[in-house]
Amino acid sequence: MFDSIRETIDYAVENNMSFADIMVKEEMELSGKSRDEVRAQMKQNLDVMRDAVIKGTTGDGVESVTGYTGHDVAKLRDYNETHHALSGYEMIDAVKGAIATNEVNAAMGIICATPTAGSSGTIPGALFKLEKTHDLTEEQMIDFLFTSALFGRVVANNASVAGATGGCQAEVGSASAMAAAAAVAIFGGSPEASGHAMALAISNLLGLVCDPVAGLVEIPCVMRNAIGSGNALISADLALAGIESRIPVDEVIEAMDKVGRNLPASLRETGLGGLAGTPTGEAIKRKIFGTAEDMVKNN
């Protein structure tokens, strides 16, 4: 287990190993399972992600129990078929996958936490877009997920991937960074470039607060995953182009941790501040749960 991204990169270079193979090796040692068994387990995760994207993008999609999120993928699909999307057709594919996954999550469907349920659309959005546009094989997609896991584990051990601890930067920000690093690795970038991709992705979302309306993983969480997927692909392209983060990746992770812990509790998943604390956010909360007095009476 590595204490930093720097150690991870150095190990990959010194041992001429891919990040995916490093993660597989560590999982084999930890679980006692064979390489085939470990990869088969990751394939199950990939299958869950694919099923969620398919469910969320089929027909009119899905709707959350509250009715406040859902069906937006269908709107985006129809728009993309009849308009020249400003962000490009391919980017819309990533956005659709991200939104679809989080709409399925909000509708109580089955998703794969990457690294959390609240950020579960960011990695699939980027990954399935790359599968479509760059003909990724299933083995490459599994490698993508192992690479994401390796980078994500370092973030989790040195900072946090929980919105309640570090804000949305720790959830969607971490997921976006994991996807960016993995994309660079899968497309032949150097280990150093993967580190820069992660640093750039986190830097771009540094300070993002966690302010779920009514405390539910719907508003603004679903759409933030769309931004996370787009940010991952942009950060990967920057790194593959040779652009570097001036702040080393481990220092960026440390900064994210400090920023997150300095956020007031109202901006760390409590549903009290930010968008959740707006008049409309409060009204939505009352409509779903009633007033505080109602809640006391019901208990």
Model-derived segments and spans:
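A structural signal for small-residue-enriched, beta-sheet-centric alpha/beta enzyme cores
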Residues: 163-176, 180-186, 191-299
